[in-house]
Curated annotation (Swiss-Prot):
Organism: Macaca fascicularis (Crab-eating macaque)
Complex formation: Core subunit of respiratory chain NADH dehydrogenase (Complex I) which is composed of 45 different subunits.
Family from the record: Belongs to the complex I subunit 4L family.
E.C. number: 7.1.1.2
Role: Core subunit of the mitochondrial membrane respiratory chain NADH dehydrogenase (Complex I) which catalyzes electron transfer from NADH through the respiratory chain, using ubiquinone as an electron acceptor. Part of the enzyme membrane arm which is embedded in the lipid bilayer and involved in proton translocation.
UniProt xrefs under PANTHER family: NADH-UBIQUINONE OXIDOREDUCTASE CHAIN 4L, NADH-UBIQUINONE OXIDOREDUCTASE SUBUNIT ND4L
Cellular location(s): Mitochondrion inner membrane
Bilayer topology term: Multi-pass membrane protein
Source superkingdom: Eukaryota
Name assigned to this protein: NADH-ubiquinone oxidoreductase chain 4L
Reactions mediated catalytically: a ubiquinone + NADH + 5 H(+)(in) = a ubiquinol + NAD(+) + 4 H(+)(out)
Protein encoded by which gene: MT-ND4L
Amino acid sequence: MTPTYMNIMLAFTISLLGMLTYRSHLVASLLCLEGMMMSLFIMATLIASNTHFPLVNIMPIILLVFAACETAVGLALLISISNTYGLDYVHNLNLLQC
């Protein structure tokens, strides 16, 4: 395994550990989730550049679109929670409440 792949896997692992550690705050969770998505995007781009199969080249773009949608939904949740409660704690997210 090359050092580039090792660094990307290390970035993904650190983001995953940050997600598990700071799961009580929504902002920290969103930042760690974004770090995980960006490391997956870079890994998919490297794999697509190394393989010359034409259908693999669209995979990083699809992953980037999903990351942008995830960011938009996360920021909308953050604004909604901070306007309602004034805090960004995840335990304020009660999906069963109408």
